[in-house]
């Protein structure tokens, strides 16, 4: 429910109008003056009525009155004479109240009230305008509208000052029979009195008319019924309404809410107001809930039964009165007032804008009017357009306003400014923008500037504010800062050029001759290249180009239309008398009619005025001949700046011109008093002072004083349009003629020859040619703005929508209809509102659906004409795409449903009706031509629809969305409409009053009774969870009820397992693969399935690094992908590795055999030594020594003098060879002996000396000191030791090579295993992706099938939209899932790759470690080796 708001809609009525005053009345169409008319306004300000003695009252709805202004003198001389007889003639204009009224902007009627005194006229005029300024009365409730109609009945009395019963019967005739209405009147005592009107036959009637009455004298005169005004009170009228039109649908609702009782209790009423009538999204503090205290106040207002009031109950009648009261409006009532922040920069607002404001009809051949500017401004428009051209003929030297070269009538520029001045701030105080499309010469531009300054005065903003200079980065001033200011939008010179020319003009009173006649290239923005428009759509229509857009050559829509064959003109400088001299003299002499030189064949305008208030002398024209001679070769119409070059007087010595299809349109013939250069073309010639008025027969103006050329009205139509098939009996264009004119039309761009004074008046609305969004962003000039045709705007919106939105955050843009809309139709403004375009200009004279949308949108915020754009369209740190279909950050999507229940007073005819509900917003939110009720035949009074709700499931941006309610008859004619903003809409059961197609109220407004549900949008799969969170008690209570029911059926609660919510099953089914959120190591450790490490297997390999011996691998299975580590032992068991080891062993055995052969060879080289006795004796003792040594080796080990026996099993000695070493007690020498083979090596000291040793028995001393023995030992020791070292080194090198090959093979095997592991991982992930796609496809098909089978979806469009929304949601979800799967695969691959690198790195470390160990062992053995010998 809405917060309490004091809605006081009643205006203040001054006593002179409330009690009535006497005026004399006349109108434009009458020729007589109605004297002593009693004029009054009712106490509620609904109607203005005048009563004349002996006549029926005339009642005028105040909602149809545009304004009351100071009147002029009457045109009819008889009326003027009578007014002079009744008062002072010099004060007639001041004593006159000129009231204009009408149901639309174009068909405006007027009447005049002449007061007895100037003071009375001034007071009543101000009182009427004060009533009109308030817009609250347009938003009253249905009860107040019934009161309004009751007031109309009581004021609309006949000559007997009673209410005709027929008016009451006619009220209900659209749904009820007359006898039934009459019976209800009689039941309520409203039958009235009967009387027979007297027949009055005027003697002045014609003979046939008198004979008609004579023939009917025998007929019975029909009796009439009338009712006293005092009898028909509002209470009785309400009872009559409820009796004739019982609200059965409200009664059904009441019975449902009351629980079959005759009243609503306080608790039920509170629950209804807080649950049904409240938007759940509202803040509880700003919009408090209803409590008992507010219910008591509510009952006092609407419940008439005192007992019910005391008991806190509400009856059915009281409930109906509440539903139809001001406390139950469809829109928050504070939205009617000024509720928006008006201190933001000007570009942050939508501005109500008009296109070609001067036109009252079609774009071609239409009528121009200055009066329509008043209606447009009074209707709330804040940006109006003025197409300014040089006047021709008698109006030469005066700027006019017309649609140039489109055969439209003209109005004076000065007259339009007066109308703007009088009405600019009559309804709204916020600034008005005048959009000039300037085609005038500099002299007329000077007049335009002077007219603006003189007429507007202080209202004109002639220079920027000091705190808001025209500098880069400076924001525009706010609407509050610009209150009651008029801004001019016109091209402007560059700053330095403007300053120079303006100083010269103010100093000398004129400009240089070159500046006067040449186009000025120093216009800001005109030297930049504009991007070509992409938007004509291939229609071939000439695109109208605004003054700040591209030239015609830059617009492809213009280029494609220029397929008209043009004939090259010839210049005839001979005047009417054939004198070339007079023609040449006209170049040197100023024209008598205003001093203008007309050169119609220039590509750009050279027409300039030399006569104005500040010029001291006339320029010398003799210097222009060379320029003119060149310009004469140009096309006469391509760049002509005249408004109507086609109506100039043809002068040619040749035969009369014949109209040609390929040439320009035929021209009017008129004589003129001045001479100029005459251009002759095929089918068209011009003369000096030919008229420029174009009036089509079908659009004859009603008032002469509203045209710049009224004298052309008759002769031009009758004589000069015959070439197009026009005649007196054919006042309108045929389709073929219109197409012909349209094909030959060529739009002329606005002039760049700007007068510095007019340029200096442009400030915050400086139009420039659009050069691109990046250029505009780089310049950062907020006061620059650009205009786009709807085609061009759609092109930019299609290509660069976010950039367009950002552009509109900083500066303004204006959108106008494309030139192909010759019927003045409109485009959908919502498209450009979505992009933040401020001035979306429409044709106000055409009240189509799109104009209704514009009027309905700007009806709020006090009707100021300014609406603050949503936050995301203003903040520079936010990015917004108007084509987005997903919710915007910070904006909560809404869900809206509308159920049309019934209607009241929809039509005054007994005809079938239906209701259509549409939504306009973002493209994804816009729903049109889908939701309509069934036709209820033969009842235009109170049809009951009771349709199923029209559901708008997901509204992405509620702030931009509006609802449109429209009622049509069975033939498709619109009966009423209403535009309501979604962000201000109230939920619950509401009555919606409808408006006319021009957004005006009716005397008895049609009303729709609807139920509106607004809440936060929740996806279907989460609705159950949201409901449970919103009301957990109800959710648990429902669960408990079901549990008790199952227990009653014998089912134990323990037998029921917990199951997931079916609403989330589909979502869970898609999301079943779990996501891993651990570290990368954990993620990889849980990945993979390993098998054998053999290279020929394609199964998964282990994915762990080479671990230390104490580290134990721990394989874990995740996502059905088991991982085991790669073990080196597994790799060593590979066939290739076993084969390599076998080859290594063979190589080693071969090397050892080779070494053994070498040892055997050395032993064979010393046979003589063994025969020596001493050696033999040594040998014998050595054998004994070996025998003893075996017994005592362990005991004597480590002794300084010891016998060491070792069995060598390594390389360097034969198997089973025993080596014995004998050392002296001092340790200085030793002798080595070896046995067990053919030869025995003996170990000696390093110097080759041996010491005598006692082995078993003492060694003879002489043997030890024997030189021969010593030399033999030394020689044998050296040879043998060298051989042993060489063998050891060869074996070491072989081991190194084998170790390297071994680890190379391990590396190769590991790489293959890693490759297989990676391949298995990819195959697994691909399988998961394939499974995911299959699951997603299955889900999409199942969801689409559910939607197709959903019986709650009524229309195909809704079903398609649901499927599209579902597909988009699924697509987004599927993309996210696939992204997660891809990220998971990427992480797995990255981690596996890292682990593979670690494994290879560890393998390299192990290789180097093994190599270092081998080298260390080899060095250690070398250090521990002793010299050995064979003896």
Swiss-Prot record:
Residues 340-491 form the PI-PLC X-box domain. SUPFAM superfamilies: C-terminal domain of PLC-beta, C2 domain (Calcium/lipid-binding domain, CaLB), EF-hand, PH domain-like, PLC-like phosphodiesterases. One of its GO terms (biological process) is G protein-coupled dopamine receptor signaling pathway. Expressed in most or all neurons with high expression in the head and tail ganglia and low expression in the motor neurons of the ventral cord. Expressed in the intestine (at protein level). In males, expressed in vas deferens, spicule protractor muscles, diagonal muscles and a male-specific neuron. Residues 1150-1162 have a biased composition (Basic and acidic residues). The keyword Cell division does not apply. Keywords: Calcium, Cell junction, Cell projection, Coiled coil, Hydrolase, Lipid degradation, Lipid metabolism, Metal-binding, Synapse, Transducer. Residues 572-586, 652-661, 668-692, 1204-1216 have a biased composition (Low complexity). The keyword Lipid metabolism applies. Residues 543-556 have a biased composition (Acidic residues). GO terms for molecular function: calcium ion binding; phosphatidylinositol-4,5-bisphosphate phospholipase C activity. Residues 877-1002 form the C2 domain. Disruption phenotype: Mutant worms are similar in size to the wild-type but animals are bloated with eggs due to defective egg laying with decreased body flexion and sluggish locomotion. They have defects in the posterior body contraction step of the defecation motor program and become sluggish in the presence of exogenous betaine. Animals are resistant to aldicarb, a carbamate insecticide. Simultaneous knockout of egl-8 and snf-3 results in uncoordinated, hypercontracted and paralyzed animals. Its main location: other. One of its GO terms (cellular component) is synapse. This is 1-phosphatidylinositol 4,5-bisphosphate phosphodiesterase beta egl-8.
């Amino acid at each position: 429910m809405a917060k309490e708001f004091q809605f006081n809609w009643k205006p203040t009525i001054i006593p002179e109008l409330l009690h009535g005053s006497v005026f004399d009345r006349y109108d434009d169409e009458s020729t007589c003056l109605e004297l002593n008319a009693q004029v009054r306004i009712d106490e509620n300000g609904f109607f203005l009525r005048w009563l004349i003695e002996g006549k029926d009252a005339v009642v005028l709805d105040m909602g149809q009155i545009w304004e009351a202004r100071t009147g002029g003198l009457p045109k009819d001389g008889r009326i003027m004479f009578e007014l002079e007889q009744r008062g002072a003639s010099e004060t007639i204009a001041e004593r006159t109240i000129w009231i204009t009224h009408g149901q639309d902007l174009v068909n405006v009627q007027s009447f005049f009230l002449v007061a007895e005194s100037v003071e009375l006229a001034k007071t009543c005029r101000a009182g009427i305008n004060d009533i009109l300024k308030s817009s609250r009365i347009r938003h009253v409730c249905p009860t107040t509208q019934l009161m309004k109609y009751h007031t109309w009945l009581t004021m609309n009395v006949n000559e007997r000052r009673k209410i005709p019963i027929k008016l009451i019967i006619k009220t209900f005739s659209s749904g009820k029979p007359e006898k039934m209405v009459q019976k209800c009147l009689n039941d309520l005592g409203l039958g009235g009195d009967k009387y027979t009107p007297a027949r009055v036959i005027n003697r002045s009637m014609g003979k046939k008319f008198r004979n008609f009455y004579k023939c009917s004298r025998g007929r019975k005169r029909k009796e009439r019924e009338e009712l006293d005004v005092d009898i028909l009170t509002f209470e009785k009228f309400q009872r009559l309404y409820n009796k004739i039109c019982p609200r059965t649908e409200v009664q059904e609702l009441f019975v449902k809410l009351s629980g079959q009782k005759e009243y609503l209790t306080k608790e039920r009423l509170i629950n209804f107001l807080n649950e049904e009538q409240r938007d759940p999204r509202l803040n509880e503090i700003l919009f408090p809930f209803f409590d008992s205290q507010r219910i008591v106040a509510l009952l006092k207002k609407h419940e008439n039964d005192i007992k019910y009031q005391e008991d806190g109950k509400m009856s059915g009648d009281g409930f109906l009165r509440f539903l139809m009261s001001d406390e139950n409006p469809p829109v928050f009532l504070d939205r009617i007032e000024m509720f928006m922040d008006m201190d933001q920069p000007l570009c942050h607002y939508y501005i109500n804008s008009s296109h070609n404001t001067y036109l009252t009809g079609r774009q071609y051949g239409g009528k121009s009017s200055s009066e329509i500017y008043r209606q447009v401004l009074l209707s709330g428009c804040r940006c109006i357009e003025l197409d300014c051209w040089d006047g021709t003929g008698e109006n030469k030297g005066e700027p006019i306003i017309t649609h140039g070269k489109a055969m439209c009538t003209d109005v004076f520029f000065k007259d339009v400014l007066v109308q703007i001045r009088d009405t600019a701030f009559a309804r709204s105080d916020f600034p008005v923008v005048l959009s000039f499309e300037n085609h005038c010469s500099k002299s007329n531009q000077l007049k335009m500037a002077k007219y603006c300054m003189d007429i507007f005065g202080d209202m004109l903003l002639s220079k920027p504010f000091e705190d808001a200079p025209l500098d880069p980065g400076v924001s525009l001033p706010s609407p509050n800062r610009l209150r009651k200011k008029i801004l001019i939008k016109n091209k402007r010179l560059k700053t330095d050029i403007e300053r120079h020319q303006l100083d010269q003009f103010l100093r000398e009173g004129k400009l240089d001759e070159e500046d006067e006649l040449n186009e000025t290239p120093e216009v800001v923005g005109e030297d930049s290249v504009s991007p070509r428009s992409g938007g004509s759509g291939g229609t071939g229509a000439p695109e109208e180009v605004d003054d700040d857009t591209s030239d015609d050559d830059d617009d492809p829509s213009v280029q494609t239309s220029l397929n008209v064959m043009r004939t090259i003109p010839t210049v005839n400088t001979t005047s009417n008398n054939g004198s070339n001299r007079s023609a040449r003299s006209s170049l040197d002499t100023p024209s008598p009619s205003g001093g203008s030189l007309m050169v119609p064949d220039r590509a750009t305008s050279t027409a300039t005025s030399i006569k104005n208030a500040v010029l001291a002398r006339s320029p010398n024209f003799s210097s222009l001949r060379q320029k003119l001679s060149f310009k004469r070769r140009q096309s006469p119409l391509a760049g002509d700046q005249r408004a109507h070059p086609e109506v100039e007087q043809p002068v040619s010595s040749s035969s009369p011109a014949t109209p040609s299809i390929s040439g320009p349109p035929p021209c009017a013939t008129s004589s003129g008093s001045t001479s100029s250069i005459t251009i002759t073309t095929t089918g068209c010639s011009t003369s000096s002072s030919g008229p420029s008025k174009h009036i089509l027969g079908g659009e004859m103006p009603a008032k002469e004083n509203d045209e710049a050329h009224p004298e052309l009205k008759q002769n031009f139509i009758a004589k000069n349009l015959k070439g197009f098939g026009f005649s007196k009996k054919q006042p309108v264009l045929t389709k073929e003629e219109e197409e012909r004119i349209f094909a030959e039309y060529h739009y002329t761009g606005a002039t760049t020859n700007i007068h510095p004074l007019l340029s200096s008046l442009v400030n915050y609305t400086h139009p420039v040619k659009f050069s691109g969004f990046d250029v505009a962003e780089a310049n950062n000039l907020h006061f620059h703005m650009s205009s786009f045709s709807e085609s061009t705007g759609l092109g930019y919106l299609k290509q660069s929508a976010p950039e367009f939105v950002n552009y509109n955050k900083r500066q303004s843009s204006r959108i106008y209809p494309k030139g192909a809309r010759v019927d003045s139709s409109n485009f959908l403004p919502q498209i450009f509102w979505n992009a933040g375009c401020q001035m979306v200009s429409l044709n106000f004279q055409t009240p189509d659906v799109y104009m209704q949308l514009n009027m309905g949108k700007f009806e709020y915020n006090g009707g100021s004409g300014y609406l603050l754009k949503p936050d995301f369209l203003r903040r520079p740190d936010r990015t917004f795409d108007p084509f987005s279909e997903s919710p915007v950050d910070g904006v909560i999507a809404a869900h809206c449903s509308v159920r049309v229940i019934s209607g009241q007073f929809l039509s005054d005819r007994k005809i079938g009706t239906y209701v259509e509900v549409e939504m306009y917003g973002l493209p994804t939110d816009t729903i049109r031509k889908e939701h309509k009720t069934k036709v209820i035949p033969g009842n235009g009074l109170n049809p009951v629809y009771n349709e199923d709700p029209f559901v708008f499931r997901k509204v992405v941006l509620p702030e931009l969305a509006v609802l449109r309610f429209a009622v049509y008859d069975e033939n498709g004619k619109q009966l009423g409409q209403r535009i309501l903003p979604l962000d201000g809409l109230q939920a619950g059961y509401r009555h919606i009053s409808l408006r006319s197609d021009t957004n005006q109220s009716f005397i008895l407004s049609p009303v729709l009774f609807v139920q509106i549900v607004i809440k936060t949008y929740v996806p279907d799969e989460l609705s159950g969870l949201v409901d449970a969170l919103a009301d957990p008690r109800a959710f648990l209570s429902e669960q408990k009820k079901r549990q008790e029911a199952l227990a009653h059926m014998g089912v134990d609660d323990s037998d029921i397992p917990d199951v997931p919510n079916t609403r989330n099953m589909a979502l869970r089914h898609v999301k079943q693969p779990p996501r891993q959120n651990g570290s990368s190591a954990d993620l990889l450790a849980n990945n993979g399935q390993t098998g054998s490490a053999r290279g020929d297997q394609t199964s998964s390999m282990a994915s762990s690094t080479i671990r230390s011996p104490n580290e134990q691998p721990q394989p874990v299975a995740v996502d059905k992908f088991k991982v085991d580590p790669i073990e080196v032992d597994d790799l060593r068991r590979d066939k290739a590795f076993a084969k390599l080891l076998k080859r290594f062993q063979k190589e080693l055995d071969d090397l050892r055999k080779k070494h053994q052969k070498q040892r055997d060879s050395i032993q064979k080289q010393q046979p003589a030594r063994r025969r020596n006795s001493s050696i033999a004796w040594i040998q014998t003792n050595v054998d004994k020594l070996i025998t003893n040594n075996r017994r005592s080796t362990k005991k004597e080990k480590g002794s300084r003098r010891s016998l060491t026996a070792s069995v060598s099993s390594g390389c360097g000695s034969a198997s089973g060879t025993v080596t014995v070493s004998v050392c002296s007690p001092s340790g200085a020498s030793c002798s080595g002996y070896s046995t067990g083979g053919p030869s025995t090596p003996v170990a000696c000291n390093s110097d080759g000396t041996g010491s005598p040793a006692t082995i078993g028995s003492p060694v003879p001393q002489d043997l030890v000191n024997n030189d021969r023995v010593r030399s033999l030992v030394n020689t044998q020791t050296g040879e043998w030791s060298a051989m042993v070292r060489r063998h050891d080194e060869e074996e070491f090198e072989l081991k190194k090579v084998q170790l390297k090959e071994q680890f190379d093979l391990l590396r190769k095997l590991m790489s293959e295993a890693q490759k297989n592991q990676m391949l298995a991982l990819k195959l697994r992930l691909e399988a998961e992706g394939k499974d995911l796609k299959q699951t997603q496809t299955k889900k999409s098909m199942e969801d689409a099938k559910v939607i197709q089978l959903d019986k709650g979806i009524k229309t195909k469009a809704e079903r398609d939209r649901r499927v599209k929304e579902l597909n988009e949601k699924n697509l987004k979800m599927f993309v996210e899932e696939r992204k997660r799967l891809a990220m998971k695969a990427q992480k797995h691959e990255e981690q596996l790759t890292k682990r593979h690198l670690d494994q290879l790195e560890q393998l390299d470390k192990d290789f180097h470690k093994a190599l270092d160990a081998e080298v260390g062992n080899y060095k250690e053995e070398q250090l521990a080796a002793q010299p050995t010998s064979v003896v």
